[in-house]
């Protein structure tokens, strides 16, 4: 799990369960699950009980999906994200 250094301590990154994400966003549990299955968002880890855990970047990604949904289908968003990922890989 990634961590950040605050100068003196190595602080582990906060991971969120689906329920926490649902409480802080307009998305339902089923929508989060569907977006994960489609590859629009990715879990960062799993609990020992098999529950998905997401890092803080999921909130920005969900906000972006919400904005894109105003004029794009989920399939179009999926293609856009895949194209962006290919560009990032090519640039590195």
Segments from the language model and where they lie:
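Short glycine/serine/threonine/alanine-rich loop segments
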Residues: 27
């Amino acid at each position: 799990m990634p961590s950040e250094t605050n100068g003196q301590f190595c602080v582990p990154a906060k991971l969120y369960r689906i329920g926490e994400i649902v409480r802080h966003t307009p998305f339902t549990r089923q929508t989060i699950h569907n977006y994960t299955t489609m590859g629009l968002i990715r879990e960062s880890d799993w609990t020992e009980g098999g529950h998905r855990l997401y890092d803080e970047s999921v909130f920005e990604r969900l906000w972006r999906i919400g904005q894109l949904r105003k004029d794009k289908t989920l399939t179009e968003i999926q293609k856009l994200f895949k194209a962006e990922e290919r560009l990032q890989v090519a640039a590195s």
